[in-house]
């Protein structure tokens, strides 16, 4: 799995409300969160399928 999968989830500094997904190393699963729309770490995916394919394996 890519190292960015282990980055902490952060919504970013903007105030948008976008549905996104992140990988949790603790649970070895992808979870949803609200993304603000800009910046934030690389542990962010548009779909749960993309998150699973990239980080879960």
Curated annotation (Swiss-Prot):
Cystine crosslinks: 5-55, 14-38, 30-51
Top-level taxon in the UniProt lineage: Eukaryota
BPTI/Kunitz inhibitor domain boundaries: 5-55
Record localization: Secreted
PROSITE patterns: BPTI_KUNITZ_1, BPTI_KUNITZ_2
InterPro entries listed in its UniProt record: Kunitz_BPTI, Kunitz_BPTI_sf, Prtase_inh_Kunz-CS, TFPI/VKTCI-like
GO cellular component: extracellular space
Keywords (A to Z) from UniProt: Disulfide bond, G-protein coupled receptor impairing toxin, Secreted, Toxin
Tissue specificity note: Expressed by the venom gland.
Stored SMART domains: KU
Keyword Secreted assigned: yes
One Gene Ontology molecular-function label: toxin activity
Chief site of localization: secreted
Known function: Interacts with vasopressin V2 receptor (V2R/AVPR2), probably in a selective manner. Inhibits vasopressin binding human V2R in the nanomolar range (Ki=21.5 nM), and also moderately inhibits vasopressin-induced cAMP production (IC(50)=574 nM). In vivo, intraperitoneal injection of this protein into rats increases diuresis by 2-fold, without any loss of electrolytes.
Family note: Belongs to the venom Kunitz-type family.
Domain remarks in the Swiss-Prot or TrEMBL record: Exploits its two major loops and engages more positions in its interaction with V2R. The pharmacophore defined by numerous amino acids positioned in loop 1 (9 to 18) and loop 2 (34, 39 and 44) may be at the origin of the absolute selectivity of this protein for V2R.
Protein name according to UniProt: Mambaquaretin-6
């Amino acid at each position: 799995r890519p190292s960015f999968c282990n980055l902490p989830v952060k919504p970013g500094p903007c105030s948008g409300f976008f549905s996104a997904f992140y990988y949790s190393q603790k649970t070895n699963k992808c979870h949803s969160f609200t993304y603000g729309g800009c910046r934030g770490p690389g542990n962010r995916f548009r779909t749960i399928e993309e998150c699973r394919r990239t980080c879960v394996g």
